Amino acid sequence: MNKLSCGRKSRVEGGQLAGDEWTRHGSFVNKPTRGWLHPDDKVMGPGVPYLVRYMGCVEVLQSMRALDFNTRTQVTREAISLVCDAVPGAKGAMRRRKTCGRSLNSILGKSNLKFAGMPITLTVSTSSLNLMASDCKQIIANHHMQSISFASGGDPDTAEYVAYVAKDPVNQRACHILECPEGLAQDVISTIGQAFELRFKQYLKNPPKLVTPHDRMAGFDGSAWDEEEEELPDHAYYNDFPGKEPPIGGVVDMRLRDGAAPAVLRQSPNHMGATLPVGQVSGAEQDSRKMQPTLQGRERFPVPCSRPPNRPDLFDDPSYVNVQNLEKSRQPLRAANGQRDIFDMKPFDDALPSAQAIVSMEDQLKREPWYQGKMSRKEAERLLKVNGDFLVRESTTTPGQYVLTGLQCGQPKHLLLVDPEGVVRTKDHRFESVSHLISYHMDNHLPIISAGSELCLQQPVERRQ
């Protein structure tokens, strides 16, 4: 393996390490031989603050998982270049990058320079990357670590910049750019690496119950999902019953009622990466010390949040099956020690402007290649060829209802994704969006349990242009 040096890249892909400054220990990695820069309890608690400049963000149109490492690096560099060219006073003395082998036009979208050039306090913890304006203390963003996919910093060509990809309701998936004082970018990216490692160690000691398929089945005699029934002429709808009304506009974005959606993070070329699940909230202190290599996390959200208890049963439409066991399983997951599961992430509602945070589910889904729009059951089934094929469509009988259609053991299955209040959920967990739900099960290779059978999401059926 190559030694980690200023001009070389060291990375972690899917938990596999590169660079012999890092070693493998059990199911995760040891810290670098020189040690981390900060005490573990500080990173796990209030977090480590850095004074940097927020330079804006550039929309990323494709999942980082679909790109190879070199392309991810090129995307990061190009995003930094675009922002530096657009923001007056940016440290633009970067050496011109070599052109990427593939065009980035289809990967990078529009820029958002709303807070460009603003001095901020970046607080790095095992919970999140918190971006707060230094003068007015306004929180620009709070990107939860479990939504981080890739981070990059201290590259020779972009030595004073840190870039990471995150997903939020305002910018969707975007590459956020931070300008650091001289020599600080390496420290920032190293601290992010430390936070990921600590978070992963917490994860190993106290894994969320949801990731164990056996536990998901234990004591379960119904379905974790509501299945779509056949489209019959006498189909019963919610407004067939006194006091029952369909959701206004199809669905209500419940994420914004309980909090904002999580974010996605990206990694740096010269440093280390680690694919780690994370989640929780942090405070802010003042201090700045130095750091080390980069790390890579999972772009999509690894762990969904639990559904609040005592919410009335929403799936009471007689056309849906296996709904009798919904209520009793909605209690938040608890860790083995009796404490609340640290991966039961609590949505944040103060990280982004509420007025701008409203993004319709339809607009979000149109960005996903596996979303087909309005489509009947039979049309959807004709598109499924092999086991593991899946797509998401809007129901032709219930506007605003989205259905996951997949093929398992040669049999098509149709699963409802959204309850009448617009919440995307399973029997005992809710997700920030349909995209969150799909990527969670794909990234973690977890089957969806329904009526005692499993549905695995392996090959997305992309819509025809």
Swiss-Prot record:
Function: Implicated in ras-dependent oocyte maturation induced by insulin/IGF1.
Signal peptide from the UniProt entry: none
Region (Disordered): 281-315
BP-aspect Gene Ontology terms: cell surface receptor protein tyrosine kinase signaling pathway; intracellular signal transduction
The name this protein goes by in its record: SHC-transforming protein 1
InterPro entries, per database record: CEP152/SHC-Transforming, PH-like_dom_sf, PID_Shc-like, PTB/PI_dom, SH2, SH2_dom_sf, SHC_SH2
Domain SH2: 370-461
Gene Ontology molecular function, alphabetical: receptor tyrosine kinase binding
Domain of life the protein comes from: Eukaryota
A GO cellular component entry from the record: cytoplasm
Major localisation: cytoplasm
Subunit structure comment from the entry: Interacts with grb2.
Tissue specificity of this protein: Highly expressed in oocytes and embryo. Also expressed in liver. Detected in ovary, testis and heart and to a lesser extent in liver (at protein level).
Keyword terms, alphabetized: Cytoplasm, Growth regulation, SH2 domain
Region (CH1): 228-369
PID domain mapped to chain residues: 44-227
SUPFAM superfamilies linked to this entry: PH domain-like, SH2 domain
Subcellular location per the Swiss-Prot or TrEMBL entry: Cytoplasm
